């Protein structure tokens, strides 16, 4: 699918980043750092999340992807300052690392191929509704009920880690990136009159607003 068409279809149901002054300041500083180092991710976590991001939001002919847009820096900054309940989905990234290696029968991250990462994304993001319901139920029960002696199944942890990475990637790409706001979405820093009900195709050419 054409990226410009795909961006129109990204709904508000995706997880979004709650911006605070501290987070905005950290976003700005991490984007300008020439010798950037992660504040949240370990080296292995940084590598695996970066690879997933490149597949989820790849570069196209006319639009840069996750790597060029440095989305990993946004996500690392958000994870550093986010509330505890907002980062539950990536608290177990080491399990995601080990599970991805085991699934591909590889001994180290540098041996993983793009196909290995794609297979992992397909397994969890394209899983059937019944499987997703099982993972969600076990995950929710752990956090909502008495957790003594209970553990979340590994596959449920991996599913929520991958889902969180995807949701944060979309949020960083769509809402928190100046290039995308000005060149892909409809960006009007000084809005005109308010019209409560308009045809999106006529108003913006079908593009969503960069600022909501």
Residue ranges and their predicted role:
Residues 1-17:
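N-terminal secretory signal peptides and thylakoid transit peptides that target proteins
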Residues 45-85:
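Long, hydrophobic N-terminal alpha-helical segment
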Residues 38-41, 60, 64, 109-110, ...:
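Generic alpha-helical structural element
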Residues 41-46, 62-66, 116, 156-160:
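Structural motif
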Residues 70-212:
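Mature-region segments of soluble proteins
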Residues 18-21, 132:
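Short amphipathic alpha-helical interaction/hinge segments
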Residues 1-5, 21-55, 59:
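C-terminal segment of N-terminal export signals and the immediately downstream linker at the start
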């Amino acid at each position: 699918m054409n990226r410009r068409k795909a961006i129109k279809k990204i709904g508000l149901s995706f997880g979004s980043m709650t911006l605070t002054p501290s987070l905005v300041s950290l976003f700005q500083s991490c984007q300008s750092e020439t010798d950037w180092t992660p504040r949240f991710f370990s080296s292995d976590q940084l590598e695996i999340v970066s690879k997933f991001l490149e597949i989820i939001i790849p570069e196209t002919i006319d639009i840069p992807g996750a790597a060029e847009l440095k989305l990993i820096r946004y996500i690392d900054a958000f994870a550093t300052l986010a509330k505890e309940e907002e980062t539950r989905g990536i608290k177990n990234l080491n399990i995601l690392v080990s599970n991805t290696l085991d699934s591909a029968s590889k001994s180290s991250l540098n041996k993983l191929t793009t196909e290995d990462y794609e297979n992992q994304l397909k397994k969890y993001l394209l899983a059937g509704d019944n499987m997703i319901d099982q993972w969600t139920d076990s995950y929710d029960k752990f956090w909502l009920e008495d957790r003594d002696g209970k553990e979340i199944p590994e596959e449920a942890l991996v599913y929520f880690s991958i889902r969180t990475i995807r949701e944060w990637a979309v949020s960083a790409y769509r809402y928190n990136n100046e290039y995308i706001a000005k060149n892909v979405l409809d960006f009007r820093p000084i809005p005109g009159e308010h019209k409560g009900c308009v045809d999106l195709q006529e108003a913006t050419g079908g593009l969503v607003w960069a600022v909501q």
